[in-house]
Amino acid sequence: MANEELTESQQQEDPSQQLPNADEEKGSDSDSNSDSDASSQSSGDDFYISESENEAEGDNTIFNYVRPSDIPPDPNANPETNIRRFNRVLDGKRVKRMQEEEEDKYTFYEDLFDFPRDPERWKEQDLREIWADGPLEMTKPGWDPAWADEDDWDVVNDEIQEGRDPGIQPFYVPYRKPYPAIPDNHYDIENAKGVVEELDRIEEFLQWVSYIFPDGSSYEGTVWDDLAQGKGVYIAENGLVRYEGEWLQNDMEGHGVIDVDIPDIEPIPGSKLEAKMRAEGRIIKRDYMTPEDRKWLEMDVEDSVALTDGNFQVPFYENEEWVTQFGEKPEKGRYRYAGQWKHSRMHGCGVYEVNERILYGRFYFGELLEEEHGCTVDICALHSGLAEVAAAKARMFVNKPDGMIREERGPYGDPQHPYFYEEDDVWMAPGFINQFYEVPEYWETYVGEVDQEREMWLNSFYKAPLRLPMPAELEHWWENVEVTPEFVLLNKEPEPDPNDPSKLVQKEDPVILHTPTGRIINYVEDEKHGIRLFWQPPLEEGEEVDPSKVEFLPLGFDEFYGKEVVVKKEHPIKSFVLGIEKSVKPMLDGLEKWTEEKKKAYEERKEMIQQELELVEAEICLEEAIEDMDEELKKKEQEEEKKTEMGLTEEDEDVLVPVYKEEKVVTAKEKIQENKQEEKYKDDDDEDDDDGDDDDDDDDDDDLGPSSFGSADKGRRNSPFSSSSLSFASCTLFPAVQSRLESSFLAWKQHRAEPSKVNTGIIKGADTASASIHFPPLSSNNARLKMGKVANRGCVQRSYGSSRSQSQLMSLSRLLSCNASSSSSPPDSSSSEYLKDSGLWETPVGDMSVVLSLQIQTKCSDLFAETPAVS
């Protein structure tokens, strides 16, 4: 009942309460209308409000209820007073105290990622690190005095000039973006523990990459957001620097091992530097190589020098910047550090080895401190071992199957699983769990144990109910398991070995099948390139491949794409000259050929003419010889006729014929002719000596011809003409002359008359001719024994024909005279004394070079000794 009464009373009061509001609303409407009218009148047609807009505004109007009160409104309730009152309240102590309490309770966003406070209260000085903020003008994330450049020092000098005191030694920590990149509204991260868990999850999404950079360096390992993160291997250009270990946003940080090799200078073979080093007693590596290795090294050096074409580059270890920074160049040899790293510097505890000299201690951004500062031998050995483990884990990521390094270096066993044994021995088993190659027997036990552990680890991924990220090697294997391989190795079924049937052997070499094209690739041994691959054509049964008709695969990119040939533009004048030369060349070649043919024909014609001349000369010589023979025959015929007229017998004839010749009176004219003839003979002899061997032999044959006239035995009484046939036969071309001479001489002998007595006075009064053997002393080594004639008063020399015929006739006459004198001389003492006194057989003193043959001298002396003088 009470509630009903209350509602009724409220309903009764509502009209009374709504009336003033209605009046006010009307008043407000009237005011608004009046205002709108006034505004519309003032603005004219420029401003117009539609009725629909007025209705909308009326619907959206909020009605405020003001409780009636007996207190009159405050006359000072204006905006300025209200603002002044609010400021007095906000500046009060109570409000400030409340704000401080709220601020203390508030957790800033940056504080969410702070690790718990250090109860030991470590400071920068305790860490041997001085941290500071860089100047505002410093555009780089940080700087270090040891590695600062000119821009960094300019900023520091400006700070000093402005009166500030920037730290000279501090190392400014480079700014790093938050790791990981966590959004503000991440619901999984509320504190430091959430950050660690997020890092663990992100670690599973690291990517395995294999890069080769433009400068020749390479990196193989894990990356996060295109930055080296996790574990990896970095190899600098030429492989002189190698780092294996942990990375943090492209910086070597954590534990790792670095190997640096600074090679010693090796001189070029045969250079002045080599001679200088040998003089100093330096050791040259080439001296300890095998002959084959030394030969290959020399060829490599020769090719390198030829290809560089005079260009060279100073290596980093020979750069003068080392002297500028450190005062001297680094020591040649091997450097190795295993330990802690920070900001790509040796920072912390570690072991440093320089050419087998071991150093250990605390390193401060690459510099070894004098004091240990807690890095004792044991601590350094511990961190060195951790670095070796990190390096071994980093090496697990080398040789990525589809990486750039594998593509550059060529074929390589697919993904590698290294096994590490005692004493740091390593054996690489290609393939996933040795599926391609078997493990050596002496490692089977150890590998079996390792494989069991590895299979348990891999099975955790195989049998997982959900699809979890797997190791990179399994991801790669599963992605390519359905892909058809590009090349397949084809082998025939093995056959039993004839020597050992229990073993199966392959009798033919395998071939390669190119699956995209279906063609077979075979190979053949090549002397130049070793092994050449070629596309094998279809073969019939029993047919063999002909290497000369097959299509070989290209040896490299140059052969595949074609080596670009640089065409040099020639000068127009040079090209014009070459064109003329090319057009004229056939004409010149034809002219040269015609000249050679003419020259050859001329030489042949010349040879024919020489042969004709020789034949003509032979004919002339033959005619002269025949004429000389005819003259000699006439002479002999006249002598025989004279003998028959004188009535000499055959016995007297043999002795008196030469004496009769000697009885002839020698006139002055004949003596002059004789002297001239002798001089002519001497000149001919001198000319013959100056000629070649053929002329000397001919002259010797002519001079020594008479020595072959028969035998010189006593008691022989043959006709002197019988022996002359030998001499004529040697001088003429026709042997028929001998028979003609013999027949004519026999006919003359048969018709001769009886010879008359010859007066002995003829012999006594006549001058005798002497013939002897004489060997004068000769100073020349070319001296020879020659035959000559001694000219006496009772002997006249006549010239018949040529000199050749004269020498033959002289030899014949002398032989005949000797035979005749030997047969007719008496063996009394008076004749011998007379002959001795007359000097017939004495050795000629005036002309020592005139000699006769030894046979003639002996024969003549014996005959005169036995023949009596003619009375």
From Swiss-Prot:
Segments of skewed composition (Polar residues): 8-20
Disordered: annotated segments: 1-85, 631-654, 669-721
One Pfam family it belongs to: MORN
Residues modified to Phosphothreonine: 649
Keywords per UniProt: Chloroplast, Coiled coil, Membrane, Phosphoprotein, Plastid, Plastid inner membrane, Protein transport, Repeat, Transport
Compositional bias of kind Low complexity: 30-46
Molecular function GO terms recorded: protein transmembrane transporter activity
Subcellular location: Plastid, Chloroplast inner membrane
Annotated MORN repeat ranges: 219-239, 243-257, 337-352
This protein's GO CC annotations: chloroplast; chloroplast envelope; chloroplast inner membrane; chloroplast thylakoid membrane; plastid
Disruption of the gene: reported phenotype: Severe defects during embryogenesis, producing abnormal embryos and thereby leading to a lethality of young seedlings.
Description of how the protein assembles with itself and partners: Part of the Tic complex. Component of the 1-MD complex, composed of TIC20-I, TIC214, TIC100 and TIC56. Interacts with the translocating preproteins. Hydrolysis of ATP is essential for the formation of this complex. The 1-MD complex interacts with TIC21.
Protein name: Protein TIC 100
Gene encoding the protein: TIC100
